[in-house]
Amino acid sequence: MTPGIHLGNITCRNELRPGDLGYIAYLHGQIYAKECGYGLGFEAYVLEGLQEFAHQYDPDRDRVWICEHDNNIVGFLLGFHRSDSMHRSDSMHRSDSGHQTDTLQLRYFILLPDYRGIGLGKKLMLEFLAFMKLSNYTRAYLWTTNEQHAAVSLYTRYGFRLTEEKISDAFDKQLTERKYELELPTNSK
């Protein structure tokens, strides 16, 4: 965290603009190479997923949170609608079949290092959960790795539970991919 950076100085928008998705891929490539040693395989994975999202983006069912400070993107989170059949047999590299769903995938959550520890991650998680409720999603899931300790701490604090693990070398090094799921209580009528 850098002195002078405060949550109140950061704005979040929900509309995509040209260049946003490309920049998010760039941030993932740069930050994860530096912090985790991920290679071009990881960047290719991110690019493929963002391309899939761009082609299937539905503003009524999907949501992006693009956090900016002084007109620069400093954080990002994406909620992507998924079919139940895809969700049940998902791996990090599967594509959506396009059916109606009540499942939302949390993807590409990233904060620049100077913007961690100021409450921005918490704010984005609360907004993600609010969008789930507003849009009548009852389930969410995400994939991460065994190296993302701070992220996992945040996810589990908001109710995500580990449901699957597998060894992978998809990011140019061996690690454990982990799936976390969240189920919201349904309102009985």
Give the ranges of each region predicted by the language model:
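C-terminal "cap" of GNAT-fold acetyltransferases
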Residues: 3-10, 20, 138-152, 156-189
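Short coil/turn segments at alpha/beta junctions that flank glycine-rich nucleotide-binding fingerprints
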Residues: 35, 118, 134-138
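Residue-level preference for beta-strand/loop junctions
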Residues: 59, 102-103, 136, 174-176
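Residues that form or flank phosphate/diphosphate-binding pockets in enzymes
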Residues: 101, 119, 150
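Active-site acidic-Proline motif in GNAT/NAT acetyltransferases
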Residues: 112-114, 118, 146-147
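Amphipathic alpha-helical dimerization/coiled-coil segments
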Residues: 1-3, 56
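Acetyl-CoA-dependent GNAT
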Residues: 14-88, 93-114, 122-127, 131, ...
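Short phosphate-binding/catalytic loops that engage adenosine nucleotides
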Residues: 111, 120, 137, 160
